[in-house]
Regions:
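N-terminal leader/linker segments that precede catalytic domains of diphosphate-processing enzymes
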Residues: 1-278
Length: 278
């Protein structure tokens, strides 16, 4: 009997190890899947499991805020200044304080984005690169960080794109937070690199006087701006019926549409109204 049990013991152990070897990885994957609470986290995990990316793969990040500005059923868009010539929402990439650069380099080993020209006005943009292993902590850090542009004052891009160009002449604005659009982690065909794009959407809450100003702008013709319907934005300005085949509206503009509100996540209070001086 003793000999019989001794001979069977290694066989039982091997079978148990084989079963555990098959079950534990799947159990581990299931636990990881439960911990991934957002689509972008799930997309990152799939790329890692498929060996498409590793901890050291360089990821490009671009974090911005965009204004939803409506006049009637049309949205106010401004011309892009970086050479595309396309119309897009008022807004741009978040910026961090000068002192914050050293913290980002120390914590996440950030690298400047090499896909866009860098000058004094864009040196501290949240348009960066870093190793994939830092991405999750970086996004959590971004939401907690105060040494950057925050929801309490998003006047800079509004001022630069509308006030300083003489398009409108307002002393202050009010807006509310609508939500956040964040892409999956994916390979971007345009820049040929893995990237993740984040955009916080805010809606302008114009006064009656400001609504009148917007209506006056809509009645004028200008190369600096245009008003577009949701349908025009969704087709990027292309209208085959009228023979307009050039895509004059940037593809990220669809993020501000009211029709796409359901696609935004709520990262903060969306009922609070913020008022800032321009």
């Amino acid at each position: 009997m003793y000999i019989f049990e001794t001979k069977l013991w290694p066989v039982g152990t091997n079978i148990a190890c084989l079963i555990l070897g098959l079950v534990l990885p799947k159990l581990g994957n299931s636990i990881e899947d439960i911990c991934d609470t957002t689509n972008w986290e799930s997309s990152q995990r799939k790329l890692e499991r498929g060996k498409f990316i590793t901890d050291n793969t360089i990821i490009r990040v671009s974090f911005a805020y965009l204004y939803r500005i409506k006049s009637g059923n049309k949205y106010l868009l401004v011309k892009n200044e970086r050479g595309t010539g396309k119309y897009q929402p008022v807004g741009g990439v978040y910026q961090f304080d000068e002192d914050e650069r050293s913290n980002l380099q120390r914590l996440f080993q950030i690298i400047d984005d090499n896909k866009m020209p860098i000058d004094e006005s864009s040196r501290n943009d949240y348009r960066l690169r870093m190793g994939n292993k830092y991405l999750r902590k970086f996004i959590k850090y971004f939401d907690k960080q105060k040494k950057r542009e925050n929801i309490e004052d998003l006047s800079r891009e509004f001022r630069e794109e509308l006030i300083e160009k003489g398009i409108i002449n307002w002393e202050k604005i009010s807006y509310r937070y609508c939500g956040r659009h964040i892409t999956d982690l994916q390979f971007g065909e345009h820049f040929q690199t893995y990237e993740i794009l984040l955009a916080d959407i805010v809606e302008l809450l114009p006064t009656e006087s400001q609504r009148n100003d917007l209506k006056s702008l809509e009645d004028k013709s200008s190369d600096q701006y245009r008003f577009a319907t949701a349908e025009e934005i969704s087709s990027f300005g292309v209208n085959t019926a009228l023979g307009q085949f050039k895509d004059e509206i940037a593809n990220h503009t669809v993020k501000i549409l009211e029709e796409n509100q359901c696609k935004l996540s709520k990262e903060m209070n969306d009922s609070k109204v913020y008022t800032v001086k321009i």
